[in-house]
Amino acid sequence: MRSARWFVALGCAALLHGQGAVPCSCGANPPGPPRTRESRPYAQAPADLRPFANFTEPYYENYTKTVEYNGAAREAPMVKPEEVTEVRIGFLGPVEDHPDQKLGRMMLHGAELAIEEANQSGGYGGKPFRLMIHNDQAVWGASSNEIVKMAYDEKVWAMFGSISGDSTHIALRVSLKAEVPIVNSAATDPTIPETIIPWYLTTLQDDRVQSYTLARRIYSDLGLRKIALLRVNDRYGRFGVLKFKDASRRLGHPVLIEQKYMPGSTDFRRQLEIIGDSGADGVVIWGDSGPAGNILKQMRAAGMKQPVFGSFRVVGDDLLATAGEAADGLEAVYPFDPTRDDPMWAAFRQRFEKRYNVQPEVFASLAYDTMTILLQAICRGGLNRGHIRDALAGVETFKGVTGEMVFDPNSKNVVPLYLAKVHNGKYEFRRYPMQAPYARVGENGVQYHGPAVDNAGAGPIPIALFGPRAEEIAARLAPQAPGYRVVPVPSEVPWGQASTKLVKVIWDDHALAMIATDRNSSHLAEQLAVKAFVPMIALSEDRALTSTNIPWILRLPKETDPAEALRRVLDAAARSGPNRAALREQLIGGNP
């Protein structure tokens, strides 16, 4: 397939927001420049993880506004469908003779399927899209030659790729010179969009988001302190761990030790012995799923019991097959939830498996969505690179087969990641934002210096649930809390009546914690929390709740499911025991 050109005939349609075929507009009403937007903080980074946040605004605060394009590409004549025989899109990816060729071929299949389905719906005014495939050899000179061929010789209307961060950087420079849009679904280098080149869109959350999410889970949520890094010795591993090391240092727990392995390695005993001797209480793997499976297997065989975490490329069926029971407990970040009940996702999986006899994984799925976004932009913008660029830059949200995407003004998908956890040989997924998981105890970090708090008594331990529809919610949550009793206190009744019942649950029944499900309930319950020394999780956006120097109030976003708040209470209680003060320390990420 060396430098092959694959042509897929038939016709095309944009899939409007990824939800169904509609006729391609063929640039009938090309969009103008996108509206000016501003989104702070950059990449949604929490304050305690942003560099120099205590001293000055980080340099990347300059990236919070829409990147302007003031060139002349929009002035080029619009090419009509009857003037072309095909609409070319360039593809750059490692599809042969490359360590990442398995990933590159899956990425190609996802992009290819999107084009085939678009062509089956009529093409661009009856003319088919054609994918011009070029192999990314991850050698700067060779890759740059392929990119130049696409932009100038083949005259593609847009480019797609690559996985390699260095090749993508080169492609971006060519796109600036040639004024050709480029979309990406696989490169995680956060510096790529920071070039302020206005021709780029990416759908995969970058290393910054992945690192901050892992750091939040490891340090703030689980309370681990001494982390060892085990990474692949290539650009993906080398660049990937930089942001995690930065986040670890900012949270007060610099990485204890960093070990490397060469691509293709299968024996990790030397690195694991060094990590074991270091006293690390957790391990982060930054690499691919195949080696990660061997690492887990060899760790457990050596008697190492530390929890293990990973970057998104750690997740894969081959890890489960290789590691077996040793994989249980692994947690890794992931862009979406492939186990969710979503008809759109299920239909895509069926179509993909029928076409390629294999289930789509992350590279194929994101490539399909990314190519769909590009096809929509071409249909809206027409055959004019400047207008295609405007259409891409104007994308703010998108619903695809992988779920919802939200793009910042820099055309990066910044939707929160998922945590994939292995349990009984299967992956379980849940959304996990990189913001402080329990907000903060006081916006400036309030401490508790009061008297010692007694343990809860014997029997099922009460947890108060206060807010609208409390009885209905408590009934739903009860099966999730064995050994505990979720006590509902409805807020729809008169406040005096609600307060009386809440006092009884807190003082007489000795509830271990409270969950207040809305703003009003949170404000009513906060005085009880401080007087009774009981931790309370408030589901509210009202910062005043955590700005009153009350060390018992913790805050989660108002849209948080009460089940998630309960889960966090139970997870913390499993480490703290039935003691309110110890529970509070665990909830805010204190020492285990």
Task: Identify the residue ranges that each predicted region occupies.
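Bacterial N-terminal signal peptides that target proteins for export
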Residues: M1-V8
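Extracytosolic ligand-binding ectodomains
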Residues: L10-C12, G20-P592
